[in-house]
Swiss-Prot record:
Family: Belongs to the MsrB Met sulfoxide reductase family.
Gene symbol of the encoding locus: msrB
UniProt catalytic activity: L-methionyl-[protein] + [thioredoxin]-disulfide + H2O = L-methionyl-(R)-S-oxide-[protein] + [thioredoxin]-dithiol
SUPFAM superfamilies on file: Mss4-like
E.C. code: 1.8.4.12
Gene3D superfamilies: Peptide methionine sulfoxide reductase (2.170.150.20)
One Gene Ontology term, aspect cellular component: cytoplasm
One Pfam match: SelR
GO molecular function: peptide-methionine (R)-S-oxide reductase activity
Gene Ontology biological process terms in this record: protein repair; response to oxidative stress
Designated name of the protein: Peptide methionine sulfoxide reductase MsrB
Organism taxonomic ancestry: Bacteria, Bacillati, Bacillota, Bacilli, Bacillales
Every MsrB domain range: 6-128
InterPro entries recorded: Met_Sox_Rdtase_MsrB, Met_Sox_Rdtase_MsrB_dom, Mss4-like_sf
Class of enzymatic activity (EC top level): oxidoreductase
C-alpha cells in the first residue's frame, strides 16, 4: 500500500484524525470515540484499513484512551523512541500508512506487561457482526 498524499488525507480524515495520525497529535483523554467501547470487534488503521487491535485484548487502564495488551499482528506495528514533551516514551505507528497511533508503556496487565495506549482518532472500529461484510471475515476466528 502506498500512503496517500497529504491533500488526499485532509479530504478523507476528520480534523482530529488528521492531527493525530499525520501530525503526531494526541486527542483529549476520556473524550474520544472508543475509550468506553466494550463491543466485540477489531480496530483498524483509519488511514490504511489494516487490522491493528482486537477487543479481546482491550481493557480499561483508566488513562482515558483505548488500551490494549497487544496488537493483532506485531508486524503491522512500528515502535520508535519519542523524546517529545520532555519525556522518553515509545511511540507506536502503523507500518503501512505510517500513522501515529499512540504509545506503548511497560505497565500493562498481560503476559508481556505492555499497555498500548492508542488514540481513538487513529482507529476505525469494525463490530464482530460486521467483520465479513466489511471485508475482514478472516478475523471472525478471533472471537470463537
Amino acid at each position: 500500500m502506498t500512503k496517500p498524499q497529504k491533500d488526499e488525507l485532509k479530504k478523507k480524515l476528520t480534523p482530529i484524525q488528521y492531527f493525530v495520525t499525520q501530525e503526531n497529535g494526541t486527542e483529549p483523554p476520556f473524550q474520544n470515540e472508543y475509550y468506553e467501547t466494550e463491543e466485540e470487534g477489531i480496530y483498524v488503521d483509519v488511514v490504511s484499513g489494516k487490522p491493528l487491535f482486537s477487543s479481546k485484548d482491550k481493557y480499561d487502564a483508566g488513562c482515558g484512551w483505548p488500551s490494549f495488551t497487544k496488537p493483532i499482528d506485531e508486524a503491522e506495528i512500528i515502535e520508535k523512541e519519542d523524546r517529545s514533551h520532555f519525556m522518553v516514551r515509545t511511540e507506536v505507528r502503523s507500518k503501512n500508512a505510517d500513522s501515529h497511533l499512540g504509545h506503548v508503556f511497560p505497565d500493562g496487565p498481560g503476559p508481556n506487561g505492555l499497555r498500548y495506549c492508542i488514540n481513538s482518532a487513529a482507529l476505525r472500529f469494525i463490530p464482530k457482526a460486521k467483520l465479513k461484510e466489511a471485508g475482514y471475515g478472516a478475523y471472525e476466528k478471533l472471537f470463537d
